[in-house]
Amino acid sequence: MKFIDEARIEVIAGDGGDGSASMRREKFVPFGGPDGGDGGRGGSVYAIADRNINTLIDYRYAKKHLARNGENGRGSDCYGKGGDDVTLRMPVGTIISDMDTGELIADLTEHDQQVMLAQGGSGGLGNLHFKSSTNRAPRQKTDGKPGERRMLRLELKVLADVGLLGMPNAGKSTFISSVSNARPKIADYPFTTLAPNLGVVRVGPSKSFVIADIPGLIEGAAEGAGLGHQFLRHLQRTGVLLHLVDLAPFDESVDPVAEATAIVGELRKYDEALYEKPRWLVLNKLDMVPEDERKARVADFLERFEWDGPVFEISALTGQGCEALCYAIYDYLAEHSDAHRAAEAEDLAADVRFRDEPPAKGGAAPGDDA
């Protein structure tokens, strides 16, 4: 499955129907008076969150979504029919923003959450509304209002519990395929992963968590180098980060400590909050290290890396240590899930895009650089 995390669409609500300027024409009723009906309202465009959808790929191909116009009013007090609404189903976790103003329209965080993207125009008034004691045969009527038209950006932040960090070829794809149902492309060269992969790890009946594998980072990723920088935002909602390190690189000139340090540096440059997120060190590819050298190599790495957090030694290829790691992750998430949700709510509340301030002139959102 190819994972699409961003799309741009245009939504066009329906125009309201025009009111009717009609007079009652009936035998034996010489002064029938006005009987023009109102126009129907235009259809609106809605988005609804659907947990059964996990990509935005449909919106890469269907970029324009139009609701129906309202029908015009007619004589005999006939009101126009309202235009049909359009409902767009999107993955849970989709963020919808206006491309012209920068306004955050919605953050779809719950299944079946519904939000209006473009409101249909109201219908015009028929001449029936303009009748008065001094104007018994009004010819006035009003036209329907045009519907809203918007260019929207859809961004999907993966709702994963665990995020994988690491240099290209650190074994992240092998790890996620060994512990979950995800089947990413795996090969012995860097940048095998070109798009995020999601996997569900099950540690027992009704006990599971979601893990996300993003493209590997390289030095300079925070400034846009490599592939991983554009997917770092997926990790902002995870509860814990797993930093995978290749402890046995094929190229002997590669220093695992230097690579691990570079990853931490890029994380901090990209987002301080992401840097402060709980992070576990996972030393991978132990099967490539002679058994009598493993203890010394691990100790040397931890000493030079100056790491005092949780450490796990695994081989994603053989599965060694993976089960214990998964159980530890589940226990941690079960213990800290409430705190994680509360922290995420605080982050969303602090987001400038949620404020009630109007956008600055010129289309820039509050907080954007001029």
UniProtKB/Swiss-Prot annotation:
Q: Which GO molecular-function terms appear in the entry?
A: GTP binding; GTPase activity; magnesium ion binding
Q: Where in the cell is it found?
A: Cytoplasm
Q: Where is the OBG-type G domain?
A: 160-334
| PROSITE patterns, alphabetized | G_OBG, GTP1_OBG, OBG
Q: Where is it found, in Gene Ontology cellular component terms? A: cytoplasm
What is the main EC category here? hydrolase
Give the transmembrane ranges.
Answer: none
Q: Does the keyword Phosphoprotein apply?
A: no
Q: Where is the Obg domain?
A: 1-159
Residues involved in GTP binding: 166-173, 191-195, 213-216, 284-287, 315-317
The UniProt annotation puts the region (Disordered) at 127-146
User: What CDD domains does the entry give?
Assistant: Obg (cd01898)
Q: Which GO terms describe its biological process?
A: ribosome biogenesis
Q: Which cofactor does it need?
A: Mg(2+)
The EC number(s) given in the record are 3.6.5.-
Q: For Mg(2+), which residues are the binding ones?
A: 173, 193
What does the UniProt keyword field contain? Cytoplasm, GTP-binding, Hydrolase, Magnesium, Metal-binding, Nucleotide-binding
As for what it does, the entry says: An essential GTPase which binds GTP, GDP and possibly (p)ppGpp with moderate affinity, with high nucleotide exchange rates and a fairly low GTP hydrolysis rate. Plays a role in control of the cell cycle, stress response, ribosome biogenesis and in those bacteria that undergo differentiation, in morphogenesis control.
Subunit-level organization: Monomer.
The family line of this record is: Belongs to the TRAFAC class OBG-HflX-like GTPase superfamily. OBG GTPase family.
Q: Which HAMAP family match?
A: GTPase_Obg (MF_01454)
Protein name (record): GTPase Obg
Q: Please tell me the species this chain comes from.
A: Burkholderia lata (strain ATCC 17760 / DSM 23089 / LMG 22485 / NCIMB 9086 / R18194 / 383)
The organism's taxonomic lineage, starting at the top: Bacteria, Pseudomonadati, Pseudomonadota, Betaproteobacteria, Burkholderiales
